Amino acid sequence: MARSFSLLMVVLVLSYKSICSLGCDLPQTHSLRNRRALILLAQMGRISPFSCLKDRHEFRFPEEEFDGHQFQKTQAISVLHEMIQQTFNLFSTEDSSAAWEQSLLEKFSTELYQQLNDLEACVIQEVGVEETPLMNEDFILAVRKYFQRITLYLMEKKYSPCAWEVVRAEIMRSFSFSTNLKKGLRRKD
């Protein structure tokens, strides 16, 4: 689980690193939205993660798809957009609404939605600049399959509170790690 999670983080960091150097202009609030989403996700925890250790799961992020790959700008934007879109979809379900405190869930969803809008503006600006559609589709498909495994896990566990806690922790680690590394990358520039 740690190795696949590390690879997920590398993908997110590479995506954010590429996005920081894009010709498109993400609003300065984009990083702030990412941090706020992380804080909200942390606040959403209702039960102790220690009580859910038996429910831990290996979601198998597709290492072979991303290992050692240099992302083009458009690919980085698309992968990051897909990751946020899938997270938004996951937390926008009726089952998710039942699992979390409603006001925190709404705020979290709003932050994700605003990040998606920021990234969509970049996608529109970058389309045609460096398009590699087939390779891009492979990355997006890999992300979708990863989130499909998360969804299947939740269904198998009947959307139990512990299953949602495991998923929340998985998503939270990815947000946290990408935020910390983005800060480090900015210091190097």
From Swiss-Prot:
UniProt record similarity statement: Belongs to the alpha/beta interferon family.
Protein name: Interferon alpha-7
Organism: Homo sapiens
Gene Ontology CC annotation, any one: extracellular region
GO molecular function list: cytokine activity; type I interferon receptor binding
Keyword Disulfide bond carried by entry: yes
Pfam families linked: Interferon
GO biological process: one example: humoral immune response
